[in-house]
Amino acid sequence: MFTTAFAQREQTQPGGLPLDLFAAIDSLKKELNAVILAHYYQEPDIQDIADFIGDSLQLARAAAKTNADVIVFAGVHFMAETAKILNPEKLVLLPDLNAGCSLADSCPPKEFAAFKAAHPDHLVVSYINCSAEIKAMSDIICTSSNAVKIVQQIPKEQPIIFAPDRNLGRYVMEQTGRDLVLWQGSCLVHETFSEKKIVQLKVAHPQAEAIAHPECESSVLRHASFIGSTAALLQYCQTSPSQEFIVATEPGIIHQMQKLAPNKHFIPAPPINNCACNECPFMRLNTLEKLYWAMKNRTPEITMSEDIRIAALRPMQRMLEMSN
């Protein structure tokens, strides 16, 4: 008699995919002693099957604490790199290696090295949305959850470079009163939101609160009643008495908002053009099918040189220490 697991493997679609992907992935998790970490911007099916869902800081903490042998990272490349930096002995898989990040790509290591050399007395605080090479050139890493807190802990006389996101950098400057030297990078998704259309939505929905991620441009942030990381936005929509929200961040988060506040209404902030530009094309590269094949074949694997990993680990550890 076939075992249940064997029978499930036999029930396949054309191309070899199991009929029940959820069950097959669950079986592979047990077989590999794997954990699935997913960002809030992933598609709903991936969020639902993940062992842990979070923002960049939460995911970094989860990666640092996991006892799993295999980390399957449903996110983008820099997030999976972060997991590898913290867990060199573990197998770290990314369902699609092409799942990059426009913000990380906006800060090429060679150009940033020259920028850093032009400011030799500056401390480098880098947003976690950057490559391992940029992390290795940094003194402290931060996330949108803790960027303000991190900068507030740095002595006021210490000049700071903030990279790579200029919009988050401006927000941190406003919140701390510090004068930061900003690298001029940005996220293509968070720069597509239309201020005009958000104002029109607020007129059409006068009871709705606009909430926004600090990667948005200041023209959008000025219309938000609350600004915060993805985790903070989720918390706010649960505790706010408002019943309707205009959400200025990647709309994948609305899946969790609806689960956590099912009686409330969430409106994705529209982009400038009539397109799906407010959806991150890189996050959308990951699918349940790719996640299955990554676990089945134990590839694509995240790798990096040990020199880069060790250099990138130090500012990551400083962040975790300073954000406790």
Curated annotation (Swiss-Prot):
Q: Which GO terms describe its cellular component?
A: cytosol
Kindly state which keywords UniProt assigns to this record, in alphabetical order.
Answer: 4Fe-4S, Cytoplasm, Iron, Iron-sulfur, Metal-binding, Pyridine nucleotide biosynthesis, Transferase
Q: Which domain of life is it from?
A: Bacteria
Q: Read off the Gene3D superfamilies from this record.
A: NadA-like
Q: Where does iminosuccinate bind?
A: 39, 56, 127-129, 144, 213-215, 230
- GO BP term (any one): 'de novo' NAD biosynthetic process from L-aspartate
Q: What is its main location?
A: cytoplasm
An MF annotation (GO) of this entry: 4 iron, 4 sulfur cluster binding
**Keyword Cytoplasm included in the entry's annotation:** yes
Report the transmembrane regions from the record. Answer: none
Q: Where does [4Fe-4S] cluster bind?
A: 101, 187, 280
Cellular localization per UniProt: Cytoplasm
Its UniProt entry gives the catalysed reaction(s) as: iminosuccinate + dihydroxyacetone phosphate = quinolinate + phosphate + 2 H2O + H(+)
Describe cofactor binding as the record notes it: Binds 1 [4Fe-4S] cluster per subunit.
* Cofactor(s), by name: [4Fe-4S] cluster
- As recorded in UniProt, its EC number(s) are 2.5.1.72
Mind telling me which PANTHER family this protein's record contains?
QUINOLINATE SYNTHASE, CHLOROPLASTIC (PTHR30573:SF0), QUINOLINATE SYNTHETASE A (PTHR30573)
Function as written in the Swiss-Prot or TrEMBL entry: Catalyzes the condensation of iminoaspartate with dihydroxyacetone phosphate to form quinolinate.
| UniProt record similarity statement | Belongs to the quinolinate synthase family. Type 2 subfamily.
State what protein this is by name.
Quinolinate synthase
Organism, as annotated: Trichormus variabilis (strain ATCC 29413 / PCC 7937)
Q: What is the lineage of its organism?
A: Bacteria, Bacillati, Cyanobacteriota, Cyanophyceae, Nostocales
Gene designation: nadA
